[in-house]
């Protein structure tokens, strides 16, 4: 007799497949549970630009508009105004770009002044800041002392020039440099080794124009004095240690506020140094990059 086939010949094999699939599902679920959990907002936070990146991006964008002569002058003027603060923020938030941010902030100030003249907009002339209201700077002692020496030297030269009515020098400008010098040396806490008097023989022999040793270009002597002061101060800041590594600082700050303190200090110094560069440009120092960034 012929053996009859079961009504459901694949039941056992089907059951086995179901069991296998179920086991696979359990394993996958277990592996998923063991994977590293996603931290809410982590990826989003990692994609956010840092203050340095934001400042530099804003600065370069506004600088491009400022330099684009195909745009309306009003748009360029407004972009230049924004670039002044954007570059200053770059100097504060990006220590490696301190020189770039400071010099380009002054360059943007000069552009604002030139375009304001074309637009018949009254704008204040450059004025040297004197560290008024600054109680501390998160910069090492040696760097502050070097800046104090640079201010003292140009202050003496301006005093000599003012006495002889050379260039744009005035006693007020001389006093501002000397006041800044005194403030910086006080903030540094270092021994005061400033010379107070300096050899100005070469300056007196070339009171109108002189060869700028940094570029080899002829420029107004008083403008070169201001520019050299700014260069010395930028070099001093560049050589300064970071807040966490400084062996001696003008004022001790807590670790929780060290970054903010450093940024604020760099911002104040960038603004002060940009005053010197702005004044040099206003007095006729070349404003193109090859001269400024020599």
Features from the language model and the residues they span:
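Bacterial N-terminal signal peptides that target proteins for export
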Residues: 4-22
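Extended, charged helical scaffold/adaptor regions
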Residues: 2-3, 26
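C-terminal motif of bacterial Sec signal peptides marking the signal peptidase cleavage site
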Residues: 30-33
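Hydrophobic helical h-region of N-terminal Sec-dependent signal peptides
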Residues: 22-28
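All-alpha RGS (Regulator of G-protein Signaling) helical domain and cognate RGS-like helical scaffolds
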Residues: 2, 35-294
């Amino acid at each position: 007799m012929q053996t009859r086939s079961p009504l459901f010949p694949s039941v056992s094999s089907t059951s086995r497949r179901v069991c296998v699939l179920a086991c696979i599902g359990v394993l996958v679920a277990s592996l998923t549970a063991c994977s590293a959990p996603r931290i809410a907002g982590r990826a989003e936070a990692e994609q956010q630009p840092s203050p340095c990146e934001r400042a530099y991006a804003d600065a370069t964008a506004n600088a491009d508009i400022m330099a684009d002569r195909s745009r309306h002058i009003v748009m360029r003027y407004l972009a230049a105004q924004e670039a002044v603060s954007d570059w200053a923020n770059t100097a504060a938030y990006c220590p490696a770009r301190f020189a770039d941010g400071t010099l380009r902030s002054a360059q943007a100030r000069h552009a604002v002044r030139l375009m304001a003249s074309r637009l018949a907009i009254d704008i204040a002339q450059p004025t040297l800041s004197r560290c008024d209201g600054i109680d501390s700077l998160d910069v090492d002692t040696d760097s502050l002392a070097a800046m104090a020496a640079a201010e003292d030297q140009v202050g003496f030269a301006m005093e000599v020039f003012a006495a002889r009515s050379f260039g744009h020098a005035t006693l007020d400008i001389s006093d501002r440099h000397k006041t800044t010098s005194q403030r910086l040396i006080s903030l540094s806490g270092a021994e005061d080794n400033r010379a107070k008097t300096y050899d100005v023989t070469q300056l007196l022999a070339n009171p109108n124009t002189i060869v700028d040793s940094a570029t080899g270009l002829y420029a107004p002597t008083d403008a070169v004095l201001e520019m050299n002061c700014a260069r010395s101060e930028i070099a001093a800041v560049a050589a300064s240690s970071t807040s966490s590594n400084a062996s001696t600082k003008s004022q001790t700050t807590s670790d929780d506020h060290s970054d903010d303190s450093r940024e604020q200090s760099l911002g104040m110094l960038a603004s002060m140094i940009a005053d010197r560069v702005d004044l040099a440009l206003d007095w006729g120092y070349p404003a193109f990059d090859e001269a400024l960034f020599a």
